[in-house]
Design a protein with these regions (language model features):
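Basic/polar phosphate-binding segments, predominantly the helix-turn-helix DNA-binding elements
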Residues: 175-182, 200-248, 253-295
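Solvent-exposed, amphipathic alpha-helical segments
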Residues: 54, 143-157, 194-205, 249, ...
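Intrinsic-disorder/low-complexity linker and hinge segments
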Residues: 185-193
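Ligand-binding loop in jelly-roll beta-barrel domains
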Residues: 78-102, 106-108
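Short, flexible helix-adjacent loops and helix caps
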Residues: 156-160, 182-186, 207
């Protein structure tokens, strides 16, 4: 079977916020323009799949998984997938450009459940045999459906500011998912939650003296295993991630506070202000003092 490549311009026309929603009601083929439900495809954006009725077999990167009402899972960009079978399927697809939403998604990293579901579950999907996906009970799914229908109505309204309303609603849905994932009693999900806790701890306590040994204990993993998993999910090492986080926080304080550069360095976990200045220049190609004057 040939793989179709879907691109963001097919779903996010214009310069508005790159968030879109599509729905599938039943088993009829081609239910909307660009419907690739039954066609093996990839896309250069992320897709959140929420199944509200029925079920089927969903093929992801060479493996078929059974899915049913209540299941929620993320398809990351450049992931091959499609429905091999579907039975009375009703689902909502939320498509979004995670690069465009990076600033908002970064804020959500303070939530361990968000990190576990959105960052780590896709990586562990194969080795967990999809047992770490989120599954909502009917009453919770009915509550979420109200949010989904509100988002769908906003997209279809075409009213001024609808892109901002879409953004606010999708962030609300992400928070709801993060909260429910953190409450999951699934042992596989709890493994990922501990990894998510590593990210949220660093985000919320970035000035602390974090080490790989300390972080790997939170994740309940051997340091070597933890380093590999973290690099796969985040694209960098834990220490580089922490350094980037501290520098970013420092940049915000330089612009939004009257604190001295030495105070900001200490607040962000740098005991040596000269070392802080060197690292800051590596990231922003200017000194902290120059950055403050510029902004």
């Amino acid at each position: 079977m040939k793989t179709v490549k879907a691109v963001r311009s097919d779903f996010f026309p214009g310069e508005g916020c790159p968030i879109a929603m599509r729905t599938i009601q039943g088993d009829a083929p081609i239910q909307h323009e660009g419907d690739l439900t039954d066609i093996r495809h990839t896309h250069d954006f992320a897709e959140l799949i929420i199944i509200t009725r029925g079920g089927g077999m969903h093929w992801i990167d060479g493996i078929s998984y059974e899915v049913a009402a209540g299941d929620i899972f993320l398809i990351q960009d450049n992931t091959e997938h499609y429905f091999q079978e579907r039975h009375d399927l009703e689902m909502y697809n939320i498509m979004f450009d995670d690069k465009y939403l990076a600033e908002h998604l970064r804020s959500l990293r303070s939530l361990s459940g968000f990190n576990a579901f959105f960052l780590f579950e896709p990586i562990f999907r194969r080795r967990h045999a999809f047992m770490s996906k989120l599954h909502l009970a009917p009453e919770l799914m009915n509550s979420l459906r109200k949010n989904l229908n509100g988002m769908l109505a906003e997209e279809r309204s075409g009213l001024p500011g609808s892109d901002l309303m879409m953004l606010s609603k999708v962030l609300e849905i992400f928070v709801l998912i993060a909260r429910e994932y953190s409450r999951s009693s699934n042992s596989k999900a709890q493994t990922l939650y501990r990894l998510g806790e590593v990210i949220s701890r660093m985000e919320n306590q970035y000035s602390e003296n974090w080490t790989v040994a300390r972080l790997s204990r939170i994740a309940a993993m051997a340091p070597s295993t933890f380093l590999g998993v973290f690099k796969e999910a985040m694209g960098t090492s834990p220490i580089e991630y922490l350094l980037n986080l501290r520098i970013t926080k420092a940049a915000g304080l330089l612009v939004n506070s009257q604190k001295s550069i030495t105070e900001i360095a200490q607040d962000c976990g740098f005991n040596d202000s000269n070392y802080f200045s060197r690292q800051f220049r590596n990231y922003y190609n200017c000194s902290p003092r120059e950055y403050r004057k510029r902004f």
